Amino acid sequence: MQKRAIYPGTFDPITNGHIDIVTRATQMFDHVILAIAASPSKKPMFTLEERVELAQQATAHLGNVEVVGFSDLMANFARNQHATVLIRGLRAVADFEYEMQLAHMNRHLMPELESVFLMPSKEWSFISSSLVKEVARHQGDVTHFLPENVHQALMAKLA
């Protein structure tokens, strides 16, 4: 039986840190679903459709990644996708407490759903989509932190 994992997030936009995590996850699992949350309460810069398209382009080189948008409760989405592993990236100790709460709640809602925490490579450990957008808004160079297609889309949004 295939081991299916979900890597959820808002990915507004997807960064090289996210690509690092999903790439490493593809080496651990047969099928990785990059699940892009609608997250209307976060007021994303990119629409869900744009985020899905950008992520599909940025992960096209990874054969066992499927990019999908979702707005469901994570445990229900995982169950519907027949996934038993939830991948979460941890950048710093500060991320851990919140992620632990989410993991416990997801486990309560779906006991067979296991959370796996991956640390990004050192090079990406300090970046977030929010930080990249903030730097870009102030004309800072963010080319190193984003896939090329995402960088172009971000610059177009900010123009």
Curated annotation (Swiss-Prot):
Co-factor(s): Mg(2+)
Entry GO terms, CC: cytoplasm
Binding site for ATP: 10-11, 18, 89-91, 99, 124-130
Subcellular location: Cytoplasm
Primary location recorded for the protein, binned into one broad class: cytoplasm
Keywords: ATP-binding, Coenzyme A biosynthesis, Cytoplasm, Magnesium, Nucleotide-binding, Nucleotidyltransferase, Transferase
EC number(s) on file: 2.7.7.3
Keyword Cytoplasm belongs to the record: yes
CDD domains: PPAT
Residues annotated to bind substrate: 10, 42, 74, 88
GO terms, biological process: coenzyme A biosynthetic process
Taxonomic superkingdom: Bacteria
Pathway: Cofactor biosynthesis; coenzyme A biosynthesis; CoA from (R)-pantothenate: step 4/5
Reactions listed under catalytic activity: (R)-4'-phosphopantetheine + ATP + H(+) = 3'-dephospho-CoA + diphosphate
Gene Ontology molecular-function annotations: ATP binding; pantetheine-phosphate adenylyltransferase activity
Function (record text): Reversibly transfers an adenylyl group from ATP to 4'-phosphopantetheine, yielding dephospho-CoA (dPCoA) and pyrophosphate.
Subunit structure: Homohexamer.
Entry similarity comment: Belongs to the bacterial CoaD family.
Record-given protein name: Phosphopantetheine adenylyltransferase
Source species of the chain: Escherichia coli O45:K1 (strain S88 / ExPEC)
